[in-house]
Amino acid sequence: MPITSEDLHGNVPDTAAVALLLIDVINDFEFENGEQLLELALPVGKQIAAVKSQAKKAGVPVVYVNDNFGKWQSDLNKIVSHCLNDGVRGEPFVKLVLPDENDYFVLKPKHSGFYCTSLELVLEHVGSRSLILAGIAGNNCVLFTANDAYMRDFKLFIPADCVVSETEEENKYALKQMEKVLKADITNIGELDLEKMKNVGPRMSADKHGSGRELKQG
């Protein structure tokens, strides 16, 4: 079992080489094309719930990285309550992916989970250098978060069956771009071994001559 501390950071394990980021899964789908996206998202929600369950068993911290709905005063309870109690489209999806008490939650004001948030500090605290990204939308907030993670030299796993966009074509294109440009592993979640992933080393970064070198830790 992972060791947790007594301080304010203790919602996640103190040492975890890999973390699971769930991006914009607490979602009301009350926007243009939201109904279309929801239809594609519901089966993906079941996959996300499955990977979260696997992560918990493997001692991998789960971090909800969620839009603040344009309200800086928003918090986790308000957002979840809105999605469950206000008759919004996203209620059946959110019920699949509800956070647990010991999950971490980061509110973001823009597309990337790293922009103006505490996400990088959380990941630094637990020592995660590899990230599993899942959520909505593959060609938008998942892509922007993946890009910023790559710029910070994180190793990326973005299971193709745990990401959804407004159309299947847009989703496939975004995944291929993340695989090609950001060196992401887009293997379906059923083919990934979270226990082995906990021991994955840092991403290789190209030096000025283009050759790979291992990034130093600490």
What are these regions (language model features)?
Residues 22, 26, 65, 159:
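Generic enzyme active-site microenvironment
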Residues 34-55, 59-61, 66:
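A short alpha/beta connector and helix-capping loop motif
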Residues 28-30, 70-76, 95-105:
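Short, basic/glycine-rich phosphate-binding loops at helix/coil junctions
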Residues 61-62, 67-82:
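Early exported N-terminus immediately downstream of N-terminal targeting peptides
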Residues 1-19, 50-58, 82-201, 216-218:
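Active-site-adjacent betaalpha module
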